[in-house]
């Protein structure tokens, strides 16, 4: 399928909505929804925004977005139901088990942050809470799509087994096989899900540095990560020889402004013949990337459940902040000469400009450009 046709198909799939039914209702706050069951998520969204995210695409939002993936991907067709139930909220139901798996290192922050909401909004299952909180979190990131949200996942009774979460040191083959086993994800869908790395940072790959971003714009949902992973690496933002990390093109930091980290898995997926063209196709294609991510997330978020058994409550997901009106650009001091050898020869690489500046880009630690960020941390068992 040509990429132009693929773009149109993905965009259509991403915006499809269930038609209003006879069960449509008006919630106590006046919001009209397709089903009365969706009303319970309106106060939850308000509580999450005011108490946890504070309307910011910051660390608390980033961590909950990560949690949606780690909770959902823990399912296996080959191992069977006892391996895990997918998007089942088991991270919250078993907060002293799954968060302690090595691949989930650091996820206890988001688990502990959501546990008070699970107790307060106790008519909502933990499984629904995790996926809805992720959709609310993403809405704070300029340029993000408005995610689909299906409600009605039951509470789980068992934790997932260890070993189902892809890790940055895994080979491309192992990653693709894991996604295939989890839910028949195609290589294109795998790359689409990695758009989440444009609003992601790492604390545990290199524990000598805090909140290392994966691109130069970690507070906006844009295509920079797909460009910057294609640049030649020049150094590490912290120590070297860390498992799952390779050299980054923007390692320079200053104070709490940490340099860019490059995951070994991102590097490999951007260069592997099975995925390189998909990776490259997202560079400077904001709408295509956002629509592709939305479609892949719709599939991920219901792993372990039948779509027909769930209720479409997408209309209570907050409308995301608009995209920043800026195309993909090479960071200051970088240009076409800094591109690594491109594996994908079928696509013409877009013509991009470089940001002005004679020194390497410093990536701000906080979305407000400062060094002190708003944040919430609840105590919990994880």
From Swiss-Prot:
The protein's required cofactors: heme b; Ca(2+)
Active site (UniProt): 70 (proton acceptor)
Alphabetical UniProt keywords: Calcium, Disulfide bond, Glycoprotein, Heme, Hydrogen peroxide, Iron, Lignin degradation, Manganese, Metal-binding, Oxidoreductase, Peroxidase, Secreted, Signal
Glycosylation sites: 100, 155, 241
Family annotation (InterPro entries): Ccp1-like, Haem_peroxidase, Haem_peroxidase_sf, Ligninase, Ligninase_C, Peroxidases_AS, Peroxidases_heam-ligand_BS
Primary site of residence: secreted
Classification via Gene3D superfamilies: 1.10.520.10, Peroxidase, domain 2 (1.10.420.10)
Enzyme Commission number, as recorded: 1.11.1.13
Signal peptide interval: 1-24
PROSITE patterns per UniProt: PEROXIDASE_1, PEROXIDASE_2, PEROXIDASE_4
Binding locations of Ca(2+) 1: 71, 86, 88, 90
GO cellular component: extracellular region
Site feature: Transition state stabilizer: 66
Co-factor note (free text): Binds 1 heme b (iron(II)-protoporphyrin IX) group per subunit. Binds 2 calcium ions per subunit.
Catalytic activity: 2 Mn(2+) + H2O2 + 2 H(+) = 2 Mn(3+) + 2 H2O
Physiological role: Catalyzes the oxidation of Mn(2+) to Mn(3+). The latter, acting as a diffusible redox mediator, is capable of oxidizing a variety of lignin compounds.
Designated name of the protein: Manganese peroxidase H4
Organism: Phanerodontia chrysosporium (White-rot fungus)
């Amino acid at each position: 399928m040509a990429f132009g046709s693929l773009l149109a198909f993905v965009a259509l799939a991403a915006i499809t909505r269930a038609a209003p039914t006879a069960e449509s209702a008006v919630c106590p706050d006046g919001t009209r929804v397709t089903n009365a069951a969706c009303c319970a998520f309106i106060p939850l969204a308000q509580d999450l925004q005011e108490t946890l995210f504070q309307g910011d695409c910051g660390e608390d939002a980033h961590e909950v977005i990560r949690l949606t993936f780690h909770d959902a991907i823990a399912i296996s067709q080959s191992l069977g139901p006892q391996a895990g139930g997918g998007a089942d909220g088991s991270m919250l139901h078993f907060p002293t088990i799954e968060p302690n798996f090595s691949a989930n290192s650091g996820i206890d922050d988001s688990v502990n942050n959501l546990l008070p909401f699970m107790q307060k909004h106790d008519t909502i299952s933990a499984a629904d809470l995790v996926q809805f909180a992720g959709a609310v979190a993403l809405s704070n990131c300029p340029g993000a799509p408005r995610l689909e949200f299906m409600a009605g996942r039951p509470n789980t009774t068992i934790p997932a087994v260890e070993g189902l979460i892809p890790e940055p040191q895994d080979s491309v083959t192992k990653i693709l096989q894991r996604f295939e086993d989890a839910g028949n994800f195609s290589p294109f869908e795998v790359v689409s899900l990695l758009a989440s790395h444009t609003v992601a940072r790492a604390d545990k790959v290199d524990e000598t540095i805090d909140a290392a971003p994966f691109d130069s714009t970690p507070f906006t949902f844009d295509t920079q990560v797909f460009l910057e992973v294609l640049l030649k690496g020049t150094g590490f933002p912290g120590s070297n020889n860390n498992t799952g990390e390779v050299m980054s093109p923007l390692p320079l930091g200053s104070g709490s402004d940490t340099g860019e980290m490059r995951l070994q898995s991102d590097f490999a997926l951007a260069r592997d013949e099975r995925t390189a063209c998909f990776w490259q196709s997202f560079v400077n294609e904001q709408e295509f990337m956002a629509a592709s991510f939305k479609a892949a997330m719709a599939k991920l978020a219901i792993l372990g459940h039948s779509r027909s058994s769930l209720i479409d409550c997408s209309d209570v997901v907050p409308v995301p902040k608009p995209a920043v009106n800026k195309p993909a650009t090479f960071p200051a001091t970088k240009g076409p000469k800094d591109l690594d050898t491109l594996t994908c020869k079928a696509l013409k690489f877009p013509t991009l400009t470089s940001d002005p500046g004679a020194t390497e880009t410093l990536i701000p630690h906080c979305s407000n450009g400062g060094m002190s960020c708003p944040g919430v941390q609840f105590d919990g068992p994880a």
